[in-house]
Structures are given as structure tokens and as C-alpha cells.
């Protein structure tokens, strides 16, 4: 894929002179890759969940050349500063045999709830770089499991 990704970032200063909220838009230039169709026929439940074709969410270029499902993180934070882990639950749901949301951020020790909203077996295989890998079968619709990355 030949293309250039440009970041347009906006900084909004919070109450502290040294803290800021970061938001922005990621633009794609060049020829957008063709969407890759996902074959849902391996599981009849998944196939019947969709009346329209399903496409992979790996690279999604919107009509205005912005990218969907982009995550930007700050690799090195403020020196000498530590911040508490947000207590709010991050939810990863399997709906229509697709993960929702496709991309999300989570901090160390922040709870992740993994849900299966489908009436079929799903497998969730987490492969974090720094912590223990997990591979969970979720055979029951409505099933919920909670994990933390430490």
C-alpha cells in the first residue's frame, strides 16, 4: 500500500500547565486499498447475522480520506509524573461475529470486559507483549469475562 498518513492534532490544555488532551484526525493520501471481504460462511450463525457483505476493518478510508479505527498513543509521558488507572470498564463485545469496537485503548490494570453477544462459540486470543497471553472460549450468548493487563 503506497500512501501517506498525516496527523492533524489539536492540543487542549487542561487545568495543569503540564497536562493536555490530545485529539485529531488522521488523513490518508494515495490510493485507498480495496476492502477485503470477510467470509462469514464458516459458522451458519455468523452467515445468517448479515444480509450484506462484511468487510475487514483493518484499513478503512472514509469518503473524505480520513482513516477509521486509528489509535495514537503517547509513548513517553511527562517526566516524573504518574497517573491513576481509570476505573471505568473497557468493553470488547462480539456482535454479529465482529469485534466492537475494532480498536480501543486500555491502560495497565484497567478492567477489560469481554462479551459474547452472539448465539455461537467465539474464541478470544489476547497476545500482549508485556503480560501473559490468554486464549478464552466463549460458548454462551451473554457470557462475560473480565481481564486486566498488568
Where are these regions (language model features)?
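Positively charged n-region of N-terminal signal peptides that target proteins for export
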Residues: 1-9
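Extracytoplasmic copper-binding redox domains, predominantly the cupredoxin/blue-copper superfamily
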Residues: 19-150
